[in-house]
Amino acid sequence: MELELKPGTTSANLYQTNTAKERYYCNFGLQRKHEHSVESAGVTISGIDTPAEARENKVDSPGSIFEPRNHPYFFGTLFIPQIVSTKEKPHPIVTGFVAVARIKQAALTR
């Protein structure tokens, strides 16, 4: 499924683009009527399904990547990044997590 990534978000920075393709294994999603509540609670909806790619039974559900503001690295996704990640070509979210973990570990061992 094609996703539009919000520029300037951690998601867009990790993918190094404003669009991405992901595979879904669910029909769940955020209902548009709750979008404002999520955003006002400090969570950015940083990846949005493109309308032409709507999943079966998915009703009015735009959000596919969620990230809290003011957190070094946390994601909620409706897809499973590790499923398509391989040793030869790791998923951007997986490599980003490893990079942040290394920085954190280095800070703890100083």
Language-model region placement:
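Amide-donor transfer/coupling interface in amidating biosynthetic enzymes
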Residues: 1-110
